[in-house]
């Protein structure tokens, strides 16, 4: 099959939401509908030993939150779907941000009782920057919820995106009876209790069908009136607005009850864009080009605790990957052979014989691959737009056992390569300073150091409030700066010079004193 045909059948997307909106449940139900898993394990179920397929790391299983991005591929009808499940927890914004550079569209999950929440707003801003098309699933309709019209108003006013309802709920909570599909003019009736298998919903054709009155009684005429109102007050779905990220089609349902998910998935594969072209520092790379290219957006250490492994997740941008092929590693300026790239179904992995644009493959990484690296078949371009953010919180890392210094350094180096934390090594001392965007990341690092590297550490406070990458083309100025400011300078994990400011005032004074130097909050990988 040609590159064009392989590309056309693929859909690569991420699921975004505020914690506890039901994102992991929906992820699992999509896999269920795609036939990738037979049984949905109820997440956070204390009695059952089953855990959600996408929360595979031990810490995630314990806490019931996703803290790393999982990659899952599954077929659905005539399509192949690459689903990236992003962390919903506030402290893992960077991982989520970088994941959104690797997808062509997003699925936003909203809790019908809570509406738009802070994380949703933040993630939406990222999608807007990239004009990512978004489909919205309003979840938990089987519980008591806010009025649906109110939810649409809130999405439009807070997230600044037009809403186009495709399905509309009939009742809510214990009176939830189903959904009306505005485009198909069909009603799907809700049957509670069909948790684990994909049940066929009873379907009634046409909103004016007398059968509806038999099933719903007075609710049927209420529904007809409500739909008239909804049609008058909302935007009709049009694909162009959706693809530009200006309009979001809205679906209602209950993920835990498998209800409304099939309609969502059908619309998604039909309307969501196939893999798109990608910008580099020299040109736009189109997916249908013959030559292979791709970029690394994530590194994950110890996916398989039995093997001390590090996997680099690479999004294929063009051409075809074939087992054993040679690829050019642009940053290192060298050709490498890729024999054993992986494909993923959460933590299940298989060796990939071939892969195409939109697919995510895993490369075994022995410390030579970094986030943002580009691989090509000889061309020397670099994919752009994969950011690193300055840390906001800092801790000094101390060992409980001084003999484990080597293991500590190895663990911190490998974990910081994943991009959720940053390791700083000051010019003036042998201290190890860990930087993060949120407090939870420090817990995660301490937990993983102990479980994966057998190293116990403690944190101490350190006199650093913010970090800035130091950029300067004038070598003489940079040398003078290094000498004068060495007590506040460190190298990050990638060997980039960083200014660790003891206070905001100090940073402002230093920036004024050194106008030739750029103090950057973000750095391209």
Swiss-Prot record:
Q: Where in the cell is it found?
A: Cytoplasm
A Gene Ontology annotation in the biological process aspect, one of them, is: regulation of translational termination
Which keywords annotate this record? Cytoplasm, GTP-binding, Nucleotide-binding, Protein biosynthesis
Q: Which residues form the signal peptide?
A: none
- Quick one: which residues bind GTP? 17-24, 85-89, 139-142
Q: Keyword Repressor, does the record have it?
A: no
Cellular component annotations (GO), alphabetically ordered: cytosol
Q: Give GO terms: molecular function aspect only.
A: GTP binding; GTPase activity; guanosine tetraphosphate binding; translation release factor activity, codon nonspecific; translation release factor activity, codon specific
| InterPro entries named in the record | EF-G-like_DII, EFG_III/V, G_TR_CS, P-loop_NTPase, PrfC, RF3_C, RF3_dom_3_sf, RF3_GTP-bd
Predominant location = cytoplasm
Give start and end of each tr-type G domain: 8-276
Entry similarity comment: Belongs to the TRAFAC class translation factor GTPase superfamily. Classic translation factor GTPase family. PrfC subfamily.
Sum up the protein's function in the record's words. Answer: Increases the formation of ribosomal termination complexes and stimulates activities of RF-1 and RF-2. It binds guanine nucleotides and has strong preference for UGA stop codons. It may interact directly with the ribosome. The stimulation of RF-1 and RF-2 is significantly reduced by GTP and GDP, but not by GMP.
What name has this protein been given in UniProt?
Answer: Peptide chain release factor 3
What is the native source organism of this protein?
Answer: Coxiella burnetii (strain CbuG_Q212)
The top of its lineage is: Bacteria, Pseudomonadati, Pseudomonadota, Gammaproteobacteria, Legionellales
